[in-house]
């Protein structure tokens, strides 16, 4: 009797682990994110909750990855760790060649501001500021000169096809346009990773497709994009889909394979 073939996801994970190095060693520079056996547990109501149970994830520079899973799968916990908003209970997390899993809160904040551009479900725009001023905001905090701020913010808005709406305030923009302003704001510091948490959660299906086209365009330009979602139809836009279940990676497939399975009702 022939041995059962290994699932594609396990083979891919094993290959990634082989090239991303051993514990304690910095991964190859091609890898922008490497987690090694990370766990996260916390106490809730006197019980220990194991949100992540040893996750090995490696993301190359310029990849477009969706992290998907149902409520309670651990995807939000993993997003918080990737975004340097939290630290693992055990294991290693390397971001752009730096081991960030044991950094102080101040050091984490610096890494977060420099390396990660966040896009959230809520747009979090200043209502009385123009699109350009909203995108400039992270550069104000970073002490960048006014001229340079305007140049970089204008470029970021052009990248999301909003060059003609720079002087408009949020209430003069559609929901999709507001989310594009938020994406431009996330891009303005030239982050290593664009980290999007349920970016279409407040949008209708047509506008969601519009935002997915923006992410696809950014990925085609070489931007590393990680998108967290519970919606298979949204995850299917990514080039790679990682599915979490019960705190572990249940599958790790190319977007093409995921779309094929989705079409078959799996």
Q: Language model features by range: what are they?
A:
Residues 29-249:
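ABC family nucleotide-binding domain
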Residues 248-266:
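Conserved beta-strand-loop-alpha-helix hinge in the C-terminal portion
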Residues 2-29:
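Pre-NBD coupling/linker segments of ABC/ABC-like ATPases
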């Amino acid at each position: 009797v022939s041995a059962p073939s290994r699932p594609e996801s396990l083979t891919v994970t094993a290959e990634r682990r082989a090239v991303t190095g051993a514990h304690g060693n910095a991964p190859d520079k091609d890898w922008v994110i490497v987690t090694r056996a990370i766990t996260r547990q916390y106490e809730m109501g006197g019980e220990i909750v194991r949100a992540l149970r040893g996750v090995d994830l490696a993301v190359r520079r310029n990849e477009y990855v969706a992290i998907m899973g149902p409520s309670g799968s651990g995807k939000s916990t993993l997003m918080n760790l990737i975004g340097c908003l939290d630290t693992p209970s055990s294991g290693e997390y390397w971001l752009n060649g730096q081991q960030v899993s044991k950094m102080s809160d101040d050091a984490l904040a610096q890494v977060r501001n420099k390396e990660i551009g966040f896009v959230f479900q809520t747009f979090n725009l200043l209502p009385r500021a123009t699109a350009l001023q909203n995108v400039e905001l992270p550069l104000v905090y970073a002490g960048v000169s006014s001229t340079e701020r305007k140049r970089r913010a204008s470029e970021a808005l052009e990248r999301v096809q909003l060059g003609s709406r720079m002087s408009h305030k949020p209430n003069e923009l559609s929901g999709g346009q507001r989310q594009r302003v938020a994406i431009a704001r996330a891009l303005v510091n030239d982050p290593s990773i664009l980290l999007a948490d349920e970016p279409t959660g407040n949008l209708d299906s047509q506008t969601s497709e519009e935002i997915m086209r923006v992410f696809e365009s950014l990925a085609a330009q070489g931007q590393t994009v990680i998108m967290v979602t519970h919606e298979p139809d949204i995850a299917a836009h990514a080039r790679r889909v990682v599915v979490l279940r019960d705190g572990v990676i249940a599958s790790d497939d190319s977007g093409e394979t995921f779309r094929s399975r989705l079409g078959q009702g799996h």
